[in-house]
Amino acid sequence: MNARRKKRLALATALIGGVAAIASLLLYALNSNLNLFYTPTEIVHGKKDTGVKPEIGQRIRVGGMVTVGSLVRDPESLHVEFAVHDAAGGEVMVTYDDLLPDLFREGQGIVAQGVLIEGGKLEATEVLAKHDENYMPPEVAEAMGQTHEKLEYDSTQKTGY
């Protein structure tokens, strides 16, 4: 092999190696920023089709209804804990250390984004409440099935006091 061909081969090899390295770094960055949506039942029992459960430490989104009577507030801080359930009976505890949205209530649909810290416990970094009595994220509506009913609220639930 002459010198010119060796130079071309080395250049082509370096170029292919560089493209492969950039592609792998790009895929790694995209994978670390991926937030998958799970229902409480899927967190507990795994996805229907594959049985895959989220791993401890994985960033996920979970959607469902806030279980009535599960909200516990710390009087000394903004820390709150509540349970989220779906129609299939799965339930996940969510902890959150910030102000809850104004529309947040027990019995309402929410989507919480955060890190799974135990098998059935999510440490949320963001909590989103539904916008009005008719709106529900498509994933939550599908997970809730036909059991979602319009809830009636008393005056204390409407005012939040």
From Swiss-Prot:
Pfam family, one: CcmE
Stated role: Heme chaperone required for the biogenesis of c-type cytochromes. Transiently binds heme delivered by CcmC and transfers the heme to apo-cytochromes in a process facilitated by CcmF and CcmH.
Spans traversing the lipid bilayer: 9-29
GO-annotated biological processes: cytochrome complex assembly
One Gene Ontology cellular component annotation held by this UniProt entry: plasma membrane
Listed name of the protein: Cytochrome c-type biogenesis protein CcmE
Record: residues binding heme: 131, 135
Regions of this protein lying in the Periplasmic compartment: 30-161
